[in-house]
From Swiss-Prot:
One of its GO terms (molecular function) is DNA binding. It is found in: Nucleus. One of its GO terms (cellular component) is nucleus. The keyword DNA-binding applies. Keywords: DNA-binding, Homeobox, Nucleus. This is Mating-type locus allele B6 protein.
Length: 410
């Protein structure tokens, strides 16, 4: 554009044509030049517009160029805004697609998980986002849908199981971070800092030759694991610290892959649910307390008092004829009073009438037999011998009856 302080319509038209031509070429290096030319033209035009000749044809051409420039600028601005919007949509859609692929398609190092487990997709997502296992709302909805679809394909074992909901999945991730030991590692080896935990997990995966989770943001490569651990602990790393971290890491990975309850299968849950009694309507729900959880102490049953009733027993006192076989002796409780002191005289009197009984009506045969027939056809044991061996003349003189009666009435 001319530097002449006087501005004519022809020069003004020439300047606009030049600007239009360069603007439509749309070269990046020409943009500052176009801005400078437009600024100069804007400054000169108000000063000379009153002195310009009235040429309708030139003025019409100037209006046409200005209109074309305005339309071109609006189109370029619309294209630029549309490009920015489309780029943002493409990035967002690509991110969602990658997340769904990462959730649905297991990685190579994690394919030892069983797809029959109810929490398969949740565990898979936990392993894939081990550096930050905090799923977004969209990821939660995707995991709920995938879990319910996979559970519905299992069959009869999930007939009575309600579908998974988003709040249940949120609670599962909270419990998983705590029970697996992820929160413990975060507290002990990362100072409860998620950024340090992310750096630590990536360093551990890199040292184990495992693929690190993808990140949309550009981050510097992970440092050595020992360096990261030492920095997080704030002191030199010891062998005990390294071993403790390795043990906690192995325990965490084992829990995430297999868990504790899901190692045995769903049939255990079905069996436990079937064994529970259905509570009656209106009955309060039993609450397990500490006293109920502890098994009752087994106490020794109280010993029964021994009976004081004397058992009938045979007398150990030798009989009159000790040379005879003692196996033929019979013990009767009625007439054992001669050798047992706890049999009352009334019992003896009720069962045997002494007034009608003569023990020596058979002569000396009574002394040769261990038993004799009493009234009522009862066999009665012979009276025990308490004195020395009796002489035949003493038996003939009748001393034995008084001796037996004296013992009977004692």
């Amino acid at each position: 554009m001319s530097r002449d302080p006087k501005l004519s319509l022809s020069k003004f038209l020439e300047c606009l044509n030049e600007i239009e031509h360069e603007f439509l070429r749309d070269k990046v290096e020409h943009r500052p030049v176009l801005v400078r030319k437009l600024q100069e033209l804007q400054q000169k035009t108000p000063k000379h517009v009153t002195n310009l000749p009235n040429d309708p044809e030139t003025i019409q051409q100037i209006h046409q160029i200005a209109h074309r420039l305005e339309v071109a600028v609006k189109v370029f601005l619309h294209i630029d805004r549309k490009f920015v919007s489309l780029r943002s949509d493409v990035v967002e859609d690509t991110s969602k697609a990658l997340q769904e692929v990462n959730v649905a398609s297991p990685a190579v190092e994690y394919r030892n998980l069983s797809e029959d487990l109810p929490a398969y997709h949740m565990r898979k997502h936990f392993l894939h986002t081990l550096d930050s296992p905090y799923p977004t709302q969209e990821e939660k909805e995707t995991l709920v849908r995938l879990t319910n679809e996979s559970t519905a394909r299992v069959g009869q074992s999930s007939v009575n199981r309600p579908p998974l909901e988003v709040h249940q999945l949120t609670l599962w991730f909270i419990n998983a971070r705590r029970r697996s030991g992820w929160s413990h590692i975060l507290k002990k080896f990362a100072r409860e800092d998620r950024s340090r935990m992310k750096h630590l997990v990536r360093a551990k995966l890199s040292s184990s030759n495992q693929s690190t989770p993808p990140s949309l943001t550009s981050e510097k490569p992970s440092d050595d694991l020992d360096v990261v651990l030492s920095d997080n602990l704030g002191r030199p790393l010891t062998l005990a610290d390294k071993q403790q971290f390795e043990d906690d890491w192995a325990s965490m990975i084992s829990w995430i892959k297999y868990g504790v309850k899901e190692k045995v299968g769903d049939w255990v849950y079905d069996l436990c649910a079937a064994s529970k009694k259905t509570p009656k309507p209106g009955m309060p729900r039993p609450v397990t307390t500490v006293a109920k959880r502890q098994p009752a102490r087994k106490t020794k049953p109280a010993a029964k008092p021994k009976s004081r009733t004397a058992n009938p027993r045979a007398s150990t006192t030798p009989s009159i004829d000790s040379t005879l076989d003692s196996s033929k002796l019979e013990s009767t409780p009625e007439l054992s009073m001669c050798s047992t002191a706890d049999t009352s005289f009334s019992t003896f009197g009720s069962s045997l009438s002494m007034s009608h009984y003569d023990p020596f009506q058979y002569g000396n045969d009574i002394l040769q037999s261990p038993t004799f027939k009493a009234r009522g056809n009862r066999k009665v044991k012979a009276l025990p011998k308490r004195a020395g061996k009796q002489q035949p003349d003493e038996i003939d003189n009748g001393k034995i009856p008084f001796f037996c009666l004296s013992i009977a009435f004692v």
